[in-house]
């Protein structure tokens, strides 16, 4: 894989060089990249929109109104939906509260929705997260998670190109056993491992939760934008055409998609 290693080095976003991926400076650099690169902003804005649309469509009967985004970091949720409480595990000037998915700082049944954009695979204890969903989210509410997909293109790229974090569909465990390990020590295939490979086991352990949707999406638009870790590959002016092409290729999303949106509702 020497060629891929050289390609990663060539395409790497230079503003991240030398930064600790678990430090606040890294998050601040990511935020600056999102603000600077319009194509990345459009991708992240689409992720936020997907969270909100799933919430409004599938949690409509929930009596609670409060919504929280986990791992808000460099994201756009606060700008697009200012009523959503933003949070992170690091003290950052642009989030509302410090919060971990395993320890939500809210009363029982007080939340309508929990959003997480590429956050779930960083959790140290996924079972604690689902227990917290069952406790803090009111019946009829739930969570919307956007995570790395598990189709052929995603497996290829996350295993061989986007390698800053592991991607292991055969991982024996759902969690890292030491909560003090860095969040970057993650398994990007975790949503597949827990909800697909071990889906029957997950449902048995959490009978009050129901997986409502698992929708693959996003490939070309993310790749050409470079995301937050790589250089942009096309002029910004090409973005509209790229998005049109991506929509035309939607029937191939199960094969090409790099992300998927997961919706889980608390039934009781």
Spans of model-derived segments:
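Conserved Class I S-adenosyl-L-methionine
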Residues: 215-265
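Conserved class I S-adenosyl-L-methionine
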Residues: 143-178
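Class I SAM-dependent methyltransferase SAM/SAH-binding core
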Residues: 65-104, 128
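Conserved alpha-helix/loop element of class I SAM-dependent methyltransferases that forms part
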Residues: 43-66
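Short alpha-helix
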Residues: 189-214
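A short glycine-rich, Lys/Arg-flanked "PGG" loop and its adjoining helix->strand segment in the class I
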Residues: 127-139
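N-terminal, positively charged/glycine-rich alpha-helical extensions of SAM-dependent methyltransferases
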Residues: 1-40, 46-50
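A conserved beta-strand element that flanks and buttresses the S-adenosyl-L-methionine
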Residues: 115
């Amino acid at each position: 894989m020497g060629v891929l290693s050289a390609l990663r080095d060539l395409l790497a976003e230079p503003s991240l060089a030398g930064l600790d991926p678990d430090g606040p400076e890294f998050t601040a650099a990511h935020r600056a990249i999102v603000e600077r690169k319009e194509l990345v902003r459009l991708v992240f804005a689409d992720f936020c929109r997907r969270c909100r649309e799933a919430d409004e469509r599938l949690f409509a009967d929930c009596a609670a109104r409060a919504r929280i985004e986990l791992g808000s970091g460099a994201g756009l949720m606060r700008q697009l939906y200012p009523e959503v409480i933003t949070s992170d595990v690091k003290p950052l000037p642009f989030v509302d509260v410090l919060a971990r998915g395993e320890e939500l700082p809210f009363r029982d049944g007080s939340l309508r929705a929990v959003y997480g954009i590429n956050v779930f695979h960083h959790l140290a204890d996924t079972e604690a997260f689902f227990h917290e969903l069952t406790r803090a989210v009111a019946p009829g509410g739930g969570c919307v998670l956007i995570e790395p997909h598990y189709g052929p293109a995603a497996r290829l790229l996350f295993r061989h190109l986007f390698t800053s974090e592991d991607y292991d569909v055969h991982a024996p465990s759902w969690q890292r056993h030491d909560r003090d390990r860095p969040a970057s020590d993650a398994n990007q295939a975790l949503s597949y491992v827990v909800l697909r490979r071990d889906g029957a086991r997950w449902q048995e352990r959490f009978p009050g939760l129901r997986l409502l949707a698992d929708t693959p999406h996003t490939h070309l638009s993310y790749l050409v934008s470079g995301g937050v870790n790589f250089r942009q590959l096309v002029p910004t002016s090409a973005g509209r055409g790229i998005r049109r092409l991506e929509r035309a290729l939607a029937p191939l999303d199960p094969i090409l998609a790099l992300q998927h949106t997961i919706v889980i509702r608390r039934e009781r």
